[in-house]
């Protein structure tokens, strides 16, 4: 399903380079990191605009649980929430000269918070349906797990949102933590019709 950019009316011009992210995305992924058992999950990401010079972002990840033998006979409760985060995507008002951006790229910032006690600022580049981010700052509550650095990659591939998240945490070097493949919810609705 081809993606049509939203009507720019009401969308701040500052966020035009991020417009392809807008909408609700749903799909699956996997988490695997030293000390964390490999697990499959489902995810919903919602990226929206209220007209300001930013896009709001929420993500909910639920672990996939094997259905019980009686699943066909009764309604199963939703899978447990494993992780949530929320934040904002922004394009800085001035183009940084020290980020190594190409002419086709725009600077981008992602500010995220999660209930496990972390707030992070990621900085990077957006261009040609790809976003590369590295952590600029990660702050944690005293009770939050030790995460010292992170990298994120988002890409629009054949109309799907692919992402990967690497972290350095618990004394381990930077390595793959989680990844996902999501489809635009509107495209899922069209396919089901």
For the regions a protein language model found, what residue spans apply to each?
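Amphipathic/hydrophobic helical signal segments and adjacent flexible N-terminal regions
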Residues: 1-54, 58-81, 158, 170-193
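Acidic/His-leaning functional-site neighborhoods
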Residues: 115-169, 188-192
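Central antiparallel beta-sheet cores of small beta-barrel/beta-sandwich binding domains
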Residues: 35-142
């Amino acid at each position: 399903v081809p993606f049509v950019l939203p009507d720019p009316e009401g969308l701040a011009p500052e966020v035009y380079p991020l417009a392809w992210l807008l909408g609700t995305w749903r799909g699956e992924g996997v988490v695997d990191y030293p000390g964390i058992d490999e697990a499959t999950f489902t995810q919903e990401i919602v990226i929206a605009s209220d007209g300001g010079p930013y896009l709001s972002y929420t993500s909910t990840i639920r672990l996939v649980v094997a259905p019980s033998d009686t699943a066909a006979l009764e309604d199963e409760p939703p899978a447990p929430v494993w992780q949530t985060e929320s934040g904002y995507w922004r394009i800085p008002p001035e183009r940084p000269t020290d980020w190594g951006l190409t002419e086709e790229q725009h600077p981008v910032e992602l500010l995220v918070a999660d209930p496990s006690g972390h707030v992070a600022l990621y900085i990077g580049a957006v261009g040609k349906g790809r976003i590369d981010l590295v952590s600029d700052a990660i702050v944690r509550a005293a009770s939050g797990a030790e995460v010292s650095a992170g990298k994120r990659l988002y890409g629009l591939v054949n109309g799907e949102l692919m992402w990967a998240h690497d972290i350095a945490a618990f004394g381990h070097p930077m390595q793959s933590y989680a990844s996902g493949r999501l489809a635009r919810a509107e495209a899922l609705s069209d396919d089901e019709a």
